[in-house]
């Protein structure tokens, strides 16, 4: 567009005013964008903080249920707040589950039993158990039996020796393909502690929060003998 010489000064003023207005508008827009971004960041930080504070509330908590004499059902979320007989029942069941999985053997469930016994055990007890069970220990049921046999155990009795020690008697039946079963009775002596800091995933299989700190087992009798026992 041609501009007359006498109008150049006025034209330059208009162009300068237009450019100044555009610059001011751009600065205002930048400030608005920066403010929106800052608000969004603060909102995200606040949301993250709220989620972080709520995470402990979402942890797994075991709930213990029992039936009263009148037939009603009651519950509690802490084993220490259970009635004495109910707390004792939970401890007895947990200790027997430990002994059952430690002393029995089946190739199909060996990994589950291995993991649970390991998680139930204090470091030294866990190390002893794993050294016994893992290859290449010749006494391991994996080596002796593999998939050719199994060991079944049945509960006989549980007795408290001290407040943190229990003796559990059980029947052990060795079944090997093509041989007569070997039945014997054994006694396991289990020393344990109660802990409150177990992760939620472990509480699912260890609701009493027990850690076995010492474990010994000895044979009582052999009621019938087949072709040999591991």
Curated annotation (Swiss-Prot):
Protein name: Protein virB8
Gene, per the UniProt record: virB8
Taxonomic path: Bacteria, Pseudomonadati, Pseudomonadota, Alphaproteobacteria, Hyphomicrobiales
Membrane topology: Single-pass membrane protein
UniProt keywords, alphabetically: Cell inner membrane, Cell membrane, Crown gall tumor, Membrane, Plasmid, Transmembrane, Transmembrane helix
Pfam families from the UniProt entry: VirB8
GO CC terms, sorted: plasma membrane
Function, as annotated: VirB proteins are suggested to act at the bacterial surface and there play an important role in directing T-DNA transfer to plant cells.
Domain of life: Bacteria
Subcellular location: Cell inner membrane
Side Periplasmic, residues: 62-230
Keyword Membrane set for record: yes
Similarity annotation: Belongs to the virB8 family.
Annotated transmembrane regions: 39-61
Residues in compartment: Cytoplasmic: 1-38
């Amino acid at each position: 567009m041609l501009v007359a010489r006498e109008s150049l000064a006025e034209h330059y003023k208009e162009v300068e005013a237009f450019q100044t207005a555009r610059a001011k508008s751009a600065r205002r827009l930048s400030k608005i964008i920066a403010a929106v971004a800052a608000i969004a960041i603060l909102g995200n930080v606040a949301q993250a903080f709220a989620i972080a504070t709520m995470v402990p509330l979402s942890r797994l908590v075991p709930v213990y249920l029992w039936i009263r004499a009148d037939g009603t059902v009651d519950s509690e979320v802490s084993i220490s707040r259970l009635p004495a007989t109910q707390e004792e029942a939970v401890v007895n069941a947990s200790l027997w589950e430990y002994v059952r999985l430690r002393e029995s053997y089946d190739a199909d469930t060996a990994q589950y039993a291995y993991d649970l016994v390991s998680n139930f055990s204090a470091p030294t007890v866990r190390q002893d158990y794993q050294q016994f069970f893992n290859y290449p220990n010749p006494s391991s049921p994996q080596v002796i039996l593999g998939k050719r046999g199994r060991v079944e155990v049945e509960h006989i009795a549980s007795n408290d020796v001290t407040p943190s020690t229990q003796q559990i008697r059980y029947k052990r039946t060795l079944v090997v393909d093509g041989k007569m079963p070997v039945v014997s009775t054994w006694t396991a002596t289990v020393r344990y502690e109660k802990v409150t800091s177990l992760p939620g995933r472990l509480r699912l299989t260890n609701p009493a929060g027990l850690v076995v700190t010492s474990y010994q087992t000895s044979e009582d009798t052999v009621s019938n003998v087949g072709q040999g026992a591991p």
